[in-house]
């Protein structure tokens, strides 16, 4: 029997063992459900929450047109309605049916809100009031036509020259980037832990002794890593594809091509990251003999993953093209999570992607040797946790 | 004669195996042979070195010195894959079903899919596991887990069997089934090396026995050969004799007195007729016999009191 067949048999056992468990099916279904929920939430609740409902009463009703326009220039979507009775309007604000009630003459508006007035809406209202006051002042000067002055003032503004074409899809790209970063983080954490738990299971159940009387340690480890990696890859692909299809269908995403590209890059980086972390997780797992000790020995590894995730969220949101982001995203422990995020934002130069992939592959080769050696040295030793140095000595 | 046999019959040869753990010599120049078709009982106290020797044979532990050969060739990975092994610390995948587990192990040992399925079903039936074939191993009783473990050692029709304590934890019926299976395997030309603390069973079952103590082989051979090496023991019943009559007889040692019967160990070349004459001198002799020591007694003699 060839080594390849042995590795394939071991990988196939892992595939069967995982794909058949209820927890895997439930886990995938729950992830998909959460994703659906998130998308629907985005398209309905958040969409509705962006509209500010303003009630106009008394003299303020004349503002129904100008308020909408003024607010739009400040990024607030106002739906103005007329309220006959200010008292009833106040009650509506108290009940949350209105976000604000505006009353009084245009030059001295009064606003009733629940707790605070949205800053942009306040500026819009202030501008309207100031215009009204200005118009009154200008009207006192005889040789001026207030409307013409106001029109001239309204036309005046800075001339903006953009160095880049504006990216209308910026928000969507960021959302896609954050989703892929979160998915990669969860997948690497979950399947890395599974590798470690699988190693500990074979060690604690002692099945490893009859296995190692048949196959070599590296075959056993490689088979396990490949098997679990394929399960993780399939799960990530399914969840990602469902997410893209749903978000496109509900029009939360209008960039399905970019999202799909991100998913493909995400799968690529999942593979690299998984290979990187799996050897470390396996080596760590092989040092202990009982499942209860697994979490403690994995803590340093999971901490690095958590760090990559937290850094990823912060850096991608604030400075996706900054020096720190660029440096961290080519370093192997962080690259599998940060780089696909930058790619999703279209902020990753091809050279940096290639460098990150090359560095990660080199690290994978190094860690596979080191991890394999620790694993082979520790896998047959039961009892208390094995010091790293002894495992390396074999 | 032995040399000729060794040439003609394949054998598992353990040759000068040494293994130290720190200051403890688990194996110290352990050498013996298990010939094809032979049941070899490996006997020794706890920590005597049986398990370490077996793990060296299977390559699970690397020996510090010495060599293990099968059919004249040093063992390599491909050869060992055709061995069947029952480790001291039992272990199977707890959440895997019995049938799947056996099929998987048969395939790992080089069987094709169909062959693996047939062999797994066959051993499930032979070891009385039919009603448990779809159960997870962790749901079985310990005795039944032990049967699955035996099936795992046998499922790939191994060329050589190395079984560490295969009879422990089995009920009497299962012991009979396993004994029959081991005899049948040996009959098919497989060398069977197994360890056991049940010496009566070893005596009944084995062609040859090896006794190990503190990492060293202290005796090896058929039970009759071990008996021959242990000297002559006679039992004398002389009811009229005064207690202590046999003390100081030339070339003899009293090894025990039981129900008035004196058991005497004779040194090499001592004439048993002289002992009989001495006994007759004390009065009537009702019984005078040569004693065939059991393996238990031979074992006690071999390891001494210090074990």
Describe the residue ranges of each PLM region.
Chain B
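Conserved N-terminal strand/loop that marks the beginning of ABC ATPase nucleotide-binding domains
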Residues: 1-17
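Structural motif
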Residues: 90, 250-253, 283
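ABC transporter nucleotide-binding domain
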Residues: 179-267
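C-terminal coupling/interaction segments
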Residues: 267-307
């Amino acid at each position: 029997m060839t080594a390849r067949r042995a590795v394939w048999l071991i990988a196939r056992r892992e595939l069967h063992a995982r794909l058949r468990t209820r927890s895997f099916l439930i886990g995938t279904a729950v992830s998909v459900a959460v994703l659906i929920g998130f998308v629907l939430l985005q398209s309905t609740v958040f969409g509705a929450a962006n509209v500010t409902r303003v009630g106009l009463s008394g003299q303020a009703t004349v503002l129904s047109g100008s308020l909408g326009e003024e607010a739009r220039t400040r990024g607030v979507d106002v739906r103005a309605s007329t309220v006959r009775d200010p008292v009833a309007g106040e009650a509506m604000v108290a009940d949350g049916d209105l976000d604000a009630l505006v009353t009084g003459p245009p030059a001295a508006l009064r606003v009733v809100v629940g707790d605070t007035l949205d800053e942009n809406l306040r500026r819009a209202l202030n501008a309207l009031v100031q215009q009204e006051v200005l118009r009154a002042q200008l009207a006192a000067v005889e040789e001026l036509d207030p409307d013409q002055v106001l029109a001239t003032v309204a036309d005046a503004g800075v001339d903006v020259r953009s160095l880049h074409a504006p990216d209308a899809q910026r928000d969507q790209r960021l959302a896609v980037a954050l989703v892929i970063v979160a998915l990669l983080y969860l997948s690497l954490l979950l399947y890395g832990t599974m590798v470690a738990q699988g190693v500990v299971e074979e060690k604690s159940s002692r099945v490893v002794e009859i296995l190692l009387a048949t196959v070599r340690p590296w075959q056993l480890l490689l088979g396990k890593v490949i098997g679990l990696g394929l399960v993780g890859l399939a799960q990530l692909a399914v969840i990602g594809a469902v997410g893209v299809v749903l978000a496109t269908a509900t029009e939360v995403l209008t960039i399905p091509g970019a999202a799909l590209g991100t998913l493909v890059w995400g799968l690529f980086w999942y593979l690299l990251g998984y290979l990187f972390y799996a050897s470390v997780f396996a080596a760590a797992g092989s040092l202990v003999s009982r499942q209860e000790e697994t979490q403690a020995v994995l803590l340093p590894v999971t901490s690095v993953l958590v760090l990559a995730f937290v850094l990823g969220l912060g850096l991608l949101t604030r400075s996706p093209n900054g020096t720190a982001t660029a440096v961290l995203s080519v370093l192997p422990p962080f690259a599998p999570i940060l780089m696909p995020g930058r790619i999703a934002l279209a902020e990753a130069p091809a050279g940096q992607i290639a460098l990150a992939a090359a560095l990660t592959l080199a690290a994978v080769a190094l860690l596979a040797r080191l991890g394999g050696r620790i694993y082979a040295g520790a896998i047959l030793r039961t009892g208390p946790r094995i010091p790293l140095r002894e495992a390396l000595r074999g | 004669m032995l040399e000729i046999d060794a040439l003609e019959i394949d054998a598992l040869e353990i040759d000068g195996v040494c293994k130290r753990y720190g200051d403890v010599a688990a194996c110290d120049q352990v050498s013996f042979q298990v010939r094809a078709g032979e049941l070899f009982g490996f006997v020794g106290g706890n920590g005597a070195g049986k398990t370490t020797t077996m793990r060296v044979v299977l390559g699970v532990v690397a020996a510090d010195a010495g060599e293990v050969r099968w059919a004249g060739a040093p063992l390599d990975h491909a050869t060992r894959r055709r061995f069947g092994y029952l480790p001291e610390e039992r272990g199977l995948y707890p959440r895997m079903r019995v049938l799947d587990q056996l099929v998987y192990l048969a395939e790992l040992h080089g069987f094709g899919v169909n062959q693996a399925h047939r062999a797994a079903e066959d051993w499930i039936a032979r070891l009385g596991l039919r009603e448990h074939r779809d159960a997870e191993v962790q749901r079985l009783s310990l005795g039944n887990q032990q049967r699955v473990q035996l099936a795992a050692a046998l499922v790939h029709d191994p060329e050589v069997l190395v079984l560490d304590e295969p009879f422990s934890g089995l009920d009497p019926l299962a012991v009979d089934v396993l004994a029959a299976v081991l005899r049948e395997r040996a009959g098919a030309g497989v060398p069977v090396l197994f360890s056991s603390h049940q010496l009566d069973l070893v005596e009944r079952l084995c062609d040859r026995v090896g006794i190990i103590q503190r990492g060293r082989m202290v005796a090896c051979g058929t039970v009759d050969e071990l008996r021959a090496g242990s000297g002559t023991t006679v039992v004398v019943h002389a009811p009229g004799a005064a207690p202590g009559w046999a003390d100081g007889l030339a070339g003899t040692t009293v090894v025990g007195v039981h129900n008035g019967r004196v058991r005497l160990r004779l040194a090499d070349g001592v004439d048993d007729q002289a002992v009989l004459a001495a006994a007759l001198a004390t009065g009537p002799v009702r019984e005078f016999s040569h004693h065939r020591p059991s393996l238990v007694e031979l074992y006690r003699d071999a390891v001494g009191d210090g074990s």
